[in-house]
């Protein structure tokens, strides 16, 4: 009998943040921390577009942002092979499953822009999975999310939707559906035993009911209180003139977030609960088990002056509790920040253990057993 798995998002940080003090300079220590806190799996960027192009090349990655603590705030050189294989071996040694995704990070040559067709998308994933299969590590893979938050233009600039302005959360168009369906079908032909999906975010979860996602094995959906009701929380905190992923945005959070939250704490918690219940019902109507690896309270946060972690942990705990009660989640994170670079969140071992235990004790959605996910959640 399997139970829901506790998973954490290590995105592209696992390979980019390897300088002294960045959190991932010692994979063994970081993964031991995963086990200590009760997590069963990590979700990482496999960089398939780069591995497919030249596995052993040293790539120069450009920063996607300077303010957040995911990834490198400056350009960084990485060699992905055999690093990915070494990381997977370290995970398997600890019986930690690995979900593969990609944020399609920009390198100096912008290789990702070649992925404009589902055929090129499929090829890069097939090539990456072949490297893993050749190393005898396929039993470590939990599922493959072909693109993070598709078709958001941060992560999928190569894809042109119809109409083109439909980017974030607009996976439901005919163009996006055709792209996803074809790409997954091609990868599945080569590796039929793995679960596949594209991950999404956004409030328009009713499209799970209205669009045919039977070619997915799971719905990976990201949900945060701060982005619900048309990002009401961020509007009340204040909008940074130069964009959300900036130091100005963190200054606004430091100045206003606590007051905005505590002035109507019950409202914000109920907003999250309502969003979770709606998402669970829509995924159930689609016949898909849920995975959420980015969640529940605030989207962007870090160790920073006047940004305490207590309210974030409290809100995330409420999200985990309510999601567990729905019985629709097969894979669940505790926050966006269960990683060693977020010291204020990571060091509270007891908090992680309490929430991962809650996840393990939740009911498993019956849909999980009907797909390949039910097999990959187990260790043989």
Predicted regions and their residues:
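Aromatic-lined substrate-binding rim segments of carbohydrate-active enzymes
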Residues: 23-107, 119, 130, 169-197, ...
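The substrate-binding groove and active-site-proximal loops of carbohydrate-active enzymes
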Residues: 10-24, 62-81, 108-123, 149-150, ...
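Boundary/entry segment of secreted carbohydrate-active catalytic domains
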Residues: 1-26, 34, 45-47
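Extracellular glycoside hydrolase catalytic/binding regions
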Residues: 136, 151-324
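Aromatic- and acidic-residue-enriched segments that line the glycan-binding/catalytic groove
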Residues: 54-68, 108-130, 156-165, 213-224, ...
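Active-site groove signature of glycoside hydrolases
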Residues: 99-112, 126-171
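Aromatic-rich peripheral "rim/lid" segments of glycoside hydrolase catalytic domains that contact
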Residues: 59-66, 302-380
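Structural preference for beta-strand elements that scaffold enzyme active sites
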Residues: 2-6, 41-43, 95-99, 139-145, ...
């Amino acid at each position: 009998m399997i139970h829901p798995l506790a998973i954490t998002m290590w995105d592209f940080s696992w390979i980019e943040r390897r300088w002294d003090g960045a959190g991932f300079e010692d994979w063994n220590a970081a993964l031991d921390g995963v086990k200590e806190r009760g997590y069963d799996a990590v979700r990482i960027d496999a960089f398939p577009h780069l591995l497919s192009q030249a596995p052993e090349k040293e790539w120069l990655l450009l920063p996607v942002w300077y303010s957040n603590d995911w990834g490198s705030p400056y350009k960084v050189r990485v060699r992905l092979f055999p690093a990915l294989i070494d990381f997977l071996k370290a995970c398997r040694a600890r019986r930690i499953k690995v979900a593969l995704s990609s944020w399609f990070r920009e390198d100096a040559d912008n290789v990702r822009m070649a992925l404009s067709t589902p055929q090129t998308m499929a090829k890069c994933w097939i090539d990456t999975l072949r490297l893993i299969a050749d190393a005898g590590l396929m039993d470590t893979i939990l599922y493959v999310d072909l693109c993070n938050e598709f078709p958001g233009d941060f992560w999928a600039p190569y894809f042109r939707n119809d109409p083109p302005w439909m980017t974030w959360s607009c996976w439901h168009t005919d163009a996006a559906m055709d792209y996803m369906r074809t790409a997954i079908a091609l990868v599945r032909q080569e590796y039929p035993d793995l679960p596949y999906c594209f991950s999404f975010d956004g409030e328009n979860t009713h499209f799970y009911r209205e669009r045919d996602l039977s070619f997915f094995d799971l719905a990976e959906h990201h949900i945060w209180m701060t982005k619900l009701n048309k990002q009401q929380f961020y509007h009340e905190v204040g909008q940074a003139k130069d964009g959300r992923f900036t130091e100005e945005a963190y200054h606004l959070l430091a100045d206003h977030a606590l007051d905005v939250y505590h002035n109507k704490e019950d409202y914000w918690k109920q907003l999250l609960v309502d969003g979770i219940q709606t998402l669970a019902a829509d995924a159930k109507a689609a016949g898909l088990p849920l995975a959420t690896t980015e969640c529940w309270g605030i989207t962007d946060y870090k160790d920073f002056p006047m940004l305490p972690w207590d309210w974030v942990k409290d809100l995330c705990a409420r999200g985990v509790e309510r999601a567990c009660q729905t019985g629709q989640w097969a894979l669940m994170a505790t926050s966006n920040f269960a990683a060693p670079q977020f010291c204020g969140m990571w060091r509270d071992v007891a908090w992680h253990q309490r929430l991962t235990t809650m996840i393990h004790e939740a009911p498993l959605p019956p849909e999980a057993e009907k797909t390949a996910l039910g097999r990959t959640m187990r260790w043989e």
